[in-house]
Curated annotation (Swiss-Prot):
Keyword Transmembrane helix in record: no
Pfam families referenced in this protein's UniProt entry, alphabetically: Ribosomal_L27
UniProt entry tagged with the keyword Protease: no
Single biological process term from Gene Ontology: translation
GO function term, MF aspect, one: structural constituent of ribosome
Domain of life per record: Bacteria
Region of interest (Disordered), residue spans: 1-22
Organism of derivation: Caulobacter sp. (strain K31)
Protein name per UniProt: Large ribosomal subunit protein bL27
Coiled-coil region(s): none
């Protein structure tokens, strides 16, 4: 017997949870070694100085310092971590 499915409410009602992607530490913020700076799909941002990239393209700090975003002439945005300047003891 041929039946037409009407509405489709039971076959359509689902969605996946958000993946919590994006920038976790912004420019100028202090980070410790191992801190996640950006979670991303693909290379929207590229690792620069003192920044590593995981297999899922997550960017993380390799040293303690401050985050800096730099856009180069090839229109790629690189994420750097600048080492903190040591204070002179007085």
């Amino acid at each position: 017997m041929a039946h037409k499915k009407s509405g489709g409410s039971s076959s359509n009602g689902r969605d996946s949870a958000g993946r919590r992607l994006g920038v976790k530490k912004f420019g100028g913020q202090k980070v410790a070694a191992g801190n996640i700076i950006i979670r991303q799909r693909g290379t929207k941002f590229y690792p620069g100085a003192n920044v590593g990239m995981g297999k899922d393209h997550t960017l993380f700090a390799l040293i303690e310092g401050a985050v800096a975003f730099v856009t180069k002439r090839n229109n790629r945005t690189y994420v750097n971590v600048a080492a903190p300047v040591a204070q002179a003891a007085e």
